[in-house]
């Protein structure tokens, strides 16, 4: 049997720039058995797919000069994994920066303030140039020791023949330091020979402060980058904390509370009202309504009875439940989602890949240019001091401060701006790629709509007031546990309806209806089919109910003693900002598609109100991922949703955007999270992404243009022609200015108005979706053959792996598998024998009992 390829996660240490992650990725990719490797510098993580042993992978990383450790995957290790994601780097860098500044400020005062502006200094140093040089040497040495990590990483990478940005920082700072030490010795010699002219000349050639300034500026950039890293892992840490910590199990006929890791398959556990389900299981006693919003994104509670399945992290809103554990530990749905999100953590922004390539060429090229510059000037007869100064100027002016800061600073500011407005970009790639969206797929419930049913219309019959209708409906529905009842109760509370009607003989009748007695009158409430059994419904009210239904609303009929008293319409209403948000997206040239499981009539009504371009109705949760896959054939797709049934689609999409009011699982399966649950934040996120990407391009353009102009100038290319030569001091100043320009440009993002649609521009590569609609219809017409398979042994959603097996068969177009129903509906374009279907399922260790 061929080894099964799996995704394994590793924590990587010692990486400092894009060149580091590229080297680790290259080293691991060369290991036999590794089919895919992705290293994320932002999360210091690595995802590896293949059959290679973890010890071999770790050794490959260590041979490349870095460290690696395999991450835990068990549910009980979630807290330890979350601890691994804790931001420890930022406090260390902040401490290094503050300490460096404590020595840099007096160093700059002595070197720049006194020498250039004649600021006062202690009398003991006045005129004592050697002492001034020694103090500068001391301060610089201390700063270099504080920031020794640059030198360790830089020279270690150079030793491994893979120079990175730290290498240039180390070489530039060390070259300045070495040159200044040489000048200090030369000045000391001149003073010993009483050559004061030479002493004064040498005094102005100290560059200790530049050596220290390089390290301090890079530390600023590293700290900004570390802060950005810390924020991108917040969502993953929240997901890990969502895992239940304890459960109440029955042992020796007693209820005892145990740690979640002590719950085993087959254990009996109990859940009281208001408590979360600890593990996946089956109800063996009791019934209740479960709020499954933690898994489905739907806020309406789902009725559960004996034999129904329950999932970890869902909330028991009412009723005492006794359940048998079926999936525990890493096998629960929640744990599988945690693992899925962890697998997706090792991603890389496209612009980081560009940085990898540039770094691999830029660093060794600059070193070669510096060496070549020195040799050429020596060959043309210049002094060693002149040649050395030109070489140092090349190293220093091309110090990749601007290049290193261009992306992380812009991303840091962009992320900060987003966070300030409730828009969280989980990674650099999400911030970069969101603005390139061509198609937006919107889940209806909780995204376009509020996700909470509300009363929209009250239509009493003649002779009955709205207050009377609402009072009777309130009295009847307050005893109901039906999800739509809460909408009527909320409306009654808003209307200050008092509890002055008492219901007796209350019965929840099968068939979506309620009945009871108020005094001597029998009242009924429910759908049209139910009420028609007990009261005559006028034709005008039937037409009104159809009109309400066409608007995407659910009409509830109420009757009293065989007389209809009115209709109350309930609907999951559209959010106030949804139509405007859709319009803004369309003005950007983005096609907007709405996905919903509703029937076509309701879906079109809501789609019309929202103003979307296309409506795809009747989409089952597992079908959303398939729709997104089809849309991706037309262009770059962003999926917006709020529940776990959106998670596969969020993952399949080029960019997954989660509404914050949804589940933590959906949030962590997505790339962007809208904390305020406003659809208008979707176009805002796209604007911010575009602005940030533009800012990064501006920063990189400046960084490269600066180097293209600065390196030849520093090398003395214009010296023979125009007499221009660049003093290393001005090279350092230029380098500092380049970094300042990059940071300042990035800070401009703080002024960006992300909710201002007046400057929106349409994308040039907008797509046409009519063909996809036609193709989808054609595919539905082609599915003329269907077979329903009854399957035993499927206990949870993970058992639906048979879907992939069936869909891999030639002639099978789609397989819709339900573990709850114990069925698989197979749609075929060609005949597939029952024997083949049966064998395919039974190869997965399930039993086929019947095929219709």
Located regions from the model:
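Flexible metal-binding regulatory segments at protein termini and peripheral loops
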Residues: 1-133, 143, 229, 254-255, ...
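Juxtamembrane coupling segments of multi-pass membrane pumps/enzymes
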Residues: 187, 196-198, 212-273, 304, ...
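Conserved ATP-binding TGD loop and adjacent catalytic N/P-domain core of P-type ATPases
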Residues: 2, 22, 35, 437, ...
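ATP-driven catalytic headpiece of P-type ATPases
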Residues: 93-95, 314, 438-442, 448-481, ...
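Membrane-embedded alpha-helical bundles of multi-pass transporters
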Residues: 116-130, 159, 178, 417, ...
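Transmembrane helix-loop-helix hairpins at the membrane interface
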Residues: 92-246, 357, 458, 723-728, ...
């Amino acid at each position: 049997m061929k080894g099964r390829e799996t995704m394994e996660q590793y924590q990587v240490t010692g990486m400092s720039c894009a060149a580091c992650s590229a080297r680790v990725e290259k080293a691991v990719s060369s290991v036999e058995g590794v089919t895919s490797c992705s290293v994320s510098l932002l999360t210091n993580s690595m995802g590896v797919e293949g059959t290679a042993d973890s010890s071999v992978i770790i050794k490959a990383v260590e041979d490349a000069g870095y460290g690696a450790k395999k991450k835990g995957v068990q549910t009980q290790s979630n807290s330890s994994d979350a601890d691994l994601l804790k931001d420890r780097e930022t406090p260390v860098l902040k401490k290094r920066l503050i300490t460096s500044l404590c020595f840099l400020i007096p160093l700059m005062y002595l070197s720049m303030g006194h020498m250039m502006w004649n600021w006062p200094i202690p009398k003991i140093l006045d005129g004592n140039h050697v002492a001034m040089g020694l103090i500068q040497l001391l301060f610089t040495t201390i700063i270099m020791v504080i920031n020794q990590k640059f030198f360790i990483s830089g020279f270690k990478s150079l030793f491994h023949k893979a120079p990175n940005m730290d290498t240039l920082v180390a070489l530039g700072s060390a070259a300045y330091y070495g040159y200044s030490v040489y000048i200090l010795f030369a000045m000391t010699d001149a003073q010993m020979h009483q050559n004061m002219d030479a002493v004064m000349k040498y005094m102005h050639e100290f560059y200790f402060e530049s050596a220290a300034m390089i390290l301090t500026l890079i530390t600023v950039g590293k700290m900004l980058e570390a802060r950005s890293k810390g924020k991108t892992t917040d969502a993953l840490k929240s997901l890990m904390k969502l895992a239940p910590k304890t459960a109440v199990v029955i042992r020796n006929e007693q209820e005892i509370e145990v740690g979640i890791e002590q719950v085993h398959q087959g254990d009996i556990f109990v859940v009281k009202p208001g408590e979360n389900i600890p593990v996946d299981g089956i109800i063996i006693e009791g019934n209740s309504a479960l709020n499954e919003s933690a898994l489905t994104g739907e806020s309406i509670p789902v009725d559960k009875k004996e034999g129904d399945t329950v999932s970890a992290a869902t909330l028991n809103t009412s009723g005492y439940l006794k359940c048998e554990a079926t999936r525990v530990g890493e096998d629960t749905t929640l744990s599988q989602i945690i693992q899925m999100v962890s697998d997706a953590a090792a991603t890389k922004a496209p612009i980081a890949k560009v940085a990898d390539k540039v770094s691999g060429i830029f660093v060794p090229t600059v070193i070669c240019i510096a060496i070549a510059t020195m040799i050429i000037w020596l060959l043309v007869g210049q002094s060693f001091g002149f040649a050395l100064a030109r070489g140092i100027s090349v190293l220093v002016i091309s110090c990749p401060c601007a290049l290193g800061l261009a992306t992380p600073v812009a991303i840091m500011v962009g992320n900060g701006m987003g966070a300030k407005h409730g828009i969280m970009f989980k990674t650099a790639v999400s911030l970069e790629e969101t603005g390139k969206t061509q198609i937006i797929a919107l889940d209806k419930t909780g995204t376009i709509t509020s996700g909470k049913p509300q009363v929209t219309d009250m239509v009493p019959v003649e002779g009955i007031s709205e207050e009377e209708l609402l009072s009777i409906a309130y009295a009847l529905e307050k005893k109901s546990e039906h999800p739509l009842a809460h909408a009527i109760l909320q409306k009654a509370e808003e209307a200050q309806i008092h509890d002055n009607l008492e219901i007796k003989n209350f019965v929840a009748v099968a068939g979506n209806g309620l009945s009871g007695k108020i005094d001597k009158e029998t009242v009924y409430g429910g759908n049209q089919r139910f009420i028609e059994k007990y009261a005559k419904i006028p034709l005008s009210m039937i037409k009104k109910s159809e009109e309400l239904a066409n608007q995407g609303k659910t009409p509830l009929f109420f009757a009293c003693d065989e007389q209809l008293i009115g209709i109350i319409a309930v609907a999951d209403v559209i959010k106030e900002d949804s139509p405007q948000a859709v319009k803004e997206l369309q003005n950007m040239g983005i096609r907007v598609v709405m996905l919903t499981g509703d029937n076509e009539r309701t879906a079109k009504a809501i789609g019309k109100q929202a103003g979307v371009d296309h409506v795809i109705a009747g989409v089952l949760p597992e079908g959303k991922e398939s729709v997104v896959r089809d849309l991706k054939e037309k262009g770059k797709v962003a999926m917006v949703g709020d529940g776990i049934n959106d998670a596969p689609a969020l993952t399949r999409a080029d960019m997954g955007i989660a509404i914050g009011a949804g589940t933590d699982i959906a949030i962590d399966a997505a790339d962007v999270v809208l904390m305020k649950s406003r659809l208008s934040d979707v176009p805002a996120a796209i604007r911010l992404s575009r602005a940030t990407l533009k800012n990064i391009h501006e920063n990189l353009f400046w960084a490269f243009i600066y180097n293209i102009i600065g390196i030849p100038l520093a090398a003395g290319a214009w010296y023979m022609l125009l007499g221009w030569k660049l003093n290393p001091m001005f090279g350092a100043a230029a380098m500092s200015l380049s970094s300042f320009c990059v940071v300042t440009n990035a800070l401009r993002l703080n002024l960006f108005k992300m909710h201002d649609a007046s400057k929106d521009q349409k994308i040039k590569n907008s797509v046409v979706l009519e063909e996809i609609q036609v193709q989808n219809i054609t595919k539905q017409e082609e599915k003329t053959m269907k077979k329903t398979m009854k399957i035993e042994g499927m206990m949870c959603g993970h058992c639906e792996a048979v879907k992939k097996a069936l869909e891999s068969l030639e002639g099978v177009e789609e397989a819709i598998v339900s573990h709850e129903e114990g069925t698989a509906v197979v749609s075929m374009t060609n005949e597939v024998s029952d024997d083949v279907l049966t064998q395919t399922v039974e190869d997965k260790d399930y039993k086929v009992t019947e095929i219709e």
